[in-house]
Amino acid sequence: MTFTPATGTESCLSAPSPGNGVGPLQRKIWTATGKADSVDSEEEGQDLESHRPQGQMGNNKSCPGQECSSRFLPAEQAEVNRLFDALSSEKLGSSASPRSFSLQALKGHVGDALPPEMVTRLFEGMRRVDGSGKAKGPSERVSQEQFTASMSHLLKGTAEEKSLVILNMISASGGPVKARDVHKFTEDLVGSVVHVLSYRRQLRGWSQKPPPGSPSRVQVLAAQLCSEMRLQGGGKLLGPQWLDRDCDQAVLEDWVFRAHHVATFLSLVIHQGFLLLRSSLKLATLVPERQVDPQREFASVLDVLSVIYVNSHLPQERRLSWRLLFATELHGNSFAQLCGRIAHGGPCLVLLEDSDGHVFGGFASCSWEVKPQFQGDDRCFLFSVSPRMAVYTCTGYNDHYMYLNQGQQTIPNGLGMGGQHGYFGLWIDVDFGKGHSKAKPTCTTYGSPQLSAQEDFQFQKMEVWAVGEAPKAESVRKTRSILDIDPEARALLEASGRGRHSEGLREVPDEP
């Protein structure tokens, strides 16, 4: 079988662009009855995160392997072929095709890079693809046609094509599955991401596991991804009562479209687990580099999964690196230290862990300034990491995105995001270690619920991470007090008769 590569320029993490010569794709997926359900999907050449793919059900013939593989560039197709040659090189008896590979061969190639359960799921998904349209049932081994078609669907396919492979990774029958089976698949997928990143030494400085005593972030992120699913009848997978509901291919297709992390994680598992087409994986924007002074390491409340999740909601240009600006473990429980380290430090993430173990925070889209007015813009958001993962974006109700003030008698002193004075979605008081998260029922600015375990909370751990490239004023910020940087704040303090006392807010700066 000869596989003809395309001449287009699309990435392995995106759908093919229109006009690249790829026609409608049709393929058959075997069901429990032994009959094939034909499925057509028309390539729309659109970004899956902004346009829903238009799939149609029909009875057309399945595509030949050449059409499936035509999505790969010449160099990519050659790499896919080389991997198949390596997998199918085992010596076989006369009864087996020499151009196919077994589950054992795939496990031997992957080794310990992926959990065995995920390798088995991938093999099951591949062997049930009928690339020729002539098979009478699922094969025991994976042919070159099946392998190429599967890689094409998972790395470059539409939400419909991905959902068909996922369905066969979950179910031996290829038919509808229970929501609990989708949930288990999602946990396996998320766990495989952590596993392979750790195995390939691609954690980029982040911890593989959350701090001791924290809920499993694998389970927390899997629950978040599953909550994006819309079950038959319109319900969401938000609790145990929904686990016995049926999920057919249409439900999975809609889910893959909504929860874009599913497709991203599948691509990551293939790229890093199979060592296939790794140059096309934008790992740097998926897992930001953790930048902390090696002489001043500390135990963060974050792990790699929570970082991946929050990072995916940042503006694209802010996803490459996170630089530590402030941590209570290093810089103490001081509001003055906090202000001095974050003011004019560029866009950043503020997060803390309350005394009940809830981890939450907010993204400040621009530099913090000490002043009595609200600041920021609609790129800001609030988020939760534990016990649940969620991001809450602006509602448009008001512009109370960010607030930072100190030394005033008639207006609140502290750091706040969303809501209003005395009723913030997230508030850190100048009396450091205290705060509140008020939302009845939700924060007006961000639509977020109460983020902390208690409305008024206490905390011991707080971190602030600058995201993306450092601002040009970074060197100024490092050498000057917040009272020097913000003349308005100093003038207000002096006008209130607190000018000399404000000098006491200066603290001997720690080592950066």
Show which residues each predicted segment covers.
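A positional/structural detector of protein chain ends, strongest at the extreme C-terminus
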Residues: 1-4, 510-512
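N-terminal alpha-helical scaffolding segments that mark the starts
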Residues: 2-3, 8, 12-17, 21-111
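Phosphate-recognition beta-domain surfaces
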Residues: 58-98, 105-130, 146-154, 168, ...
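Extended, amphipathic alpha-helical coiled-coil scaffold segments used for oligomerization/tethering
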Residues: 135-138
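Non-catalytic localization and substrate-recognition regions of ubiquitin/SUMO ligases
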Residues: 141-143
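A short alpha-helix capping/helix-loop junction motif
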Residues: 159-166
